[in-house]
Amino acid sequence: RDDYCSTSKWRFRKIINMVFGNTHTSRYTMLALVGLAGVVYCAMHLMNGFLMKSIEISDHINFLYLPSFLRLVNVLVLGLVWGTLGTAFGGILLCFWTNDSFPMALWNIAASASSAALAILAMRILQQRTLSLTKLSDLLQLALLYALLNALLHHLLWATLDPSQLVSPNQVAYMVIGDLNGAILGALALRWVATHTRLVALIRQRARTTAD
């Protein structure tokens, strides 16, 4: 059994190196990952709306919003630029299901895609170091900061451009709770993957190499 596990791990590493180790194809690989991130984000959003309909406040607010962690994961794993593009692509796909006007949908996409990147930049400034994906306190603080920023960005956007989205005097708090719940679940999952596999580290390394 030990020999079988060792062989399986060797094959897994070989596949990962074939995918991420070729500099010539690294940019195409990142574009593919951005596309995959967008599709997964879109699918998760639609699934969340279906499964969590009973605790939904509006089309944009839910007491458990699972895709919020994908916004963080995209940026933490793919990097600020590629990760933000992945979330933005997913938001564009969701335009086919939204009831918002197209300009308003684009503003919502901008707020959703940028909130995770802004939270990470703020954490780096506050902590004066790079975030650790295996340090639970880092991920929980990031989840809280992201939830606050995302809710405030959307509330400011809606209050300015689309007051019809203001459905409750407590909706900022509701949105923070929903985003925080989803982000914490995702942070725990990401920490487990980063601790027990090298997949996250390899993707992050390839993202940095491509950016350079």
Feature names for model-found ranges:
Residues 170-186, 190:
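Alpha-helical transmembrane segments that form the membrane-embedded catalytic/substrate-binding core
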Residues 11-55, 71-163, 187-195, 199-203:
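Short helix-perturbing small/polar motifs within transmembrane alpha-helices
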Residues 201-212:
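Short, charged juxtamembrane terminal tails flanking transmembrane helices
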Residues 64-65, 76, 176:
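Hydrophobic transmembrane-helix microenvironments that flank and shape a buried ionizable site
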Residues 9, 166-167:
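Extracellular/secretory pathway and lumenal proteins
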Residues 1-15:
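N-terminal amphipathic/basic-hydrophobic helices that include classical n-h-c signal peptides
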Residues 62-70:
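Hydrophobic alpha-helical segments embedded in the membrane of multi-pass proteins
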Residues 57-61, 104-106, 167-176:
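Non-cytosolic membrane-interface motifs at loop->transmembrane helix junctions
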